[in-house]
Amino acid sequence: MSITSLKNQKEFELINKLGKKLHERYFILVIATKLPKIFLESKYNTFLGIKVSRKLSKKAVVRNKIKRRIRHLIRIIVSDSSFKAIKFAMIIIPRKGFEEINFSHLNYELSKVILRNM
């Protein structure tokens, strides 16, 4: 399973427009399964965008740690065999408290939301 990141503002706006917005306690997830031609022609199956606001933390070190955790969570979730044939894109926006919650709980919450909306 190959994952790539959303590269520019146009891609983020496209997913925001086409995707379904899901508000959870620790994050907001925008997920789009019906992708435009730009994404369908790509060799990648999963497109990931991460938005970490300065409101979450003023320190870049903390924001980067949050991004690393999200990337790792997505790698774990997408490595599941049920995602092999599906092309989808998502944007994850962490909320306050995301950095304090333990990894296994985040994994459970995120996988539950993604699987429910595929």
UniProtKB/Swiss-Prot annotation:
According to its UniProt record, this protein's enzyme class is: hydrolase
Tell me, how does this one assemble? Answer: Consists of a catalytic RNA component (M1 or rnpB) and a protein subunit.
GO CC annotations on file: ribonuclease P complex
Q: Which transformation does this protein catalyse, written as a reaction?
A: Endonucleolytic cleavage of RNA, removing 5'-extranucleotides from tRNA precursor
- Write out the entry's keywords from A to Z: Endonuclease, Hydrolase, Nuclease, RNA-binding, tRNA processing
- What species does this protein belong to? Rickettsia peacockii (strain Rustic)
- Provide the family line: Belongs to the RnpA family.
Q: Which residues cross the membrane?
A: none
- Report whether tRNA processing shows up as a keyword of the record: yes
* Entry's Gene Ontology molecular function annotations: 3'-tRNA processing endoribonuclease activity; ribonuclease P activity; tRNA binding
Its job = RNaseP catalyzes the removal of the 5'-leader sequence from pre-tRNA to produce the mature 5'-terminus. It can also cleave other RNA substrates such as 4.5S RNA. The protein component plays an auxiliary but essential role in vivo by binding to the 5'-leader sequence and broadening the substrate specificity of the ribozyme.
Question: What gene name is listed for this protein?
Answer: rnpA
| Gene3D superfamilies given in the database record | 3.30.230.10
Give a yes or no for keyword Ribosomal protein in this entry.
no
- Domain of life, per UniProt, equals Bacteria
EC? 3.1.26.5
What is the protein name for this chain? Ribonuclease P protein component
**GO annotation terms (biological process):** tRNA 5'-leader removal
